[in-house]
């Protein structure tokens, strides 16, 4: 019996993986048909990784990566929701992602406000490394207190930046930031994070190397603010933009 052409197989796989009704079970079954189907299906089966309250899930995926570390290269989207205490399995997963992944989208959040410095230093350094990967184009950070603003300076190819319920830690005075390319997002979405916006806008006077983020090429901006002071900070950001096409402001 003949086999289907590769382009037809790819079409079937993309069809199963597309849309909101992703057929995981069919993809899993298809990957077991023959060896050549494994990498084609893994591309979709492992494209998104959610780390959250289920320590059992983290343990299973950590063990899977230990046996098949090449799986990490299929992960494109990381959604990490902190549920302390963090397990060693979570750290193991981050370590493998650092070595083998080409993440494109990262979301860091917490079910309630969490202090950045509460996280183990090994987790902090791994997360900063990952968000600064040159392949990352979208970053979403929510519900974190004291996230270092300078960590954003190394996100060289960031296009879409989303910050919510976030309190950034400003750079230290005269702090030197080493980078090859300044962060220049095209889209910015901030809600209840105007203190963070102030830290980013004022950063140029605090350290050598210019501002942490260059907003001059911003094309889309959306803000949710709570006070007149917040609106003032948004106005300061608008002053440095030169390509803004879409702007939305919602006051609560």
Where does each model-flagged region fall?
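Hydrophobic regular-secondary-structure patch
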Residues: 2-92, 115-118
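C-terminal capping region of solenoid repeat domains
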Residues: 11, 244-248
């Amino acid at each position: 019996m003949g086999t289907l052409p590769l382009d037809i197989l790819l079409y079937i796989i993309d069809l199963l993986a597309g849309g909101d009704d992703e057929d995981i079970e069919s993809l899993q079954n298809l990957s077991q048909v023959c060896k050549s189907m494994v990498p084609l299906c893994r591309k979709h089966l492992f494209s998104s990784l959610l780390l959250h309250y289920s320590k059992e899930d983290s343990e299973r995926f950590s063990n899977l990566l230990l046996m098949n570390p090449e799986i990490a290269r299929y992960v494109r989207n990381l959604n990490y929701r902190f549920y302390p205490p963090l397990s060693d399995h979570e750290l193991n997963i981050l370590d493998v992602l650092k070595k083998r992944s080409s993440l494109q989208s990262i979301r860091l959040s917490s079910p309630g406000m969490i202090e950045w410095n509460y996280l183990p230093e090994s987790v902090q350094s791994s997360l900063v490394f990952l968000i600064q990967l040159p392949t990352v184009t979208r970053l979403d950070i929510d519900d974190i207190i004291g996230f270092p603003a300078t960590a954003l300076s190394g996100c060289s190819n960031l296009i879409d930046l989303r910050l919510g319920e976030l309190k950034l830690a400003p750079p230290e005075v005269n702090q030197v930031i080493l980078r090859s390319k300044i962060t220049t997002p095209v889209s910015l979405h901030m809600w209840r994070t105007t203190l963070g916006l102030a830290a980013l806008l004022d950063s140029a006077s605090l350290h050598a190397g210019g501002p942490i983020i260059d907003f001059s090429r911003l094309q889309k901006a959306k803000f949710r603010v709570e006070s007149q002071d917040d609106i003032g900070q948004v106005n300061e950001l608008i002053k440095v933009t030169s390509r803004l096409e879409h702007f939305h402001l919602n006051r609560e």
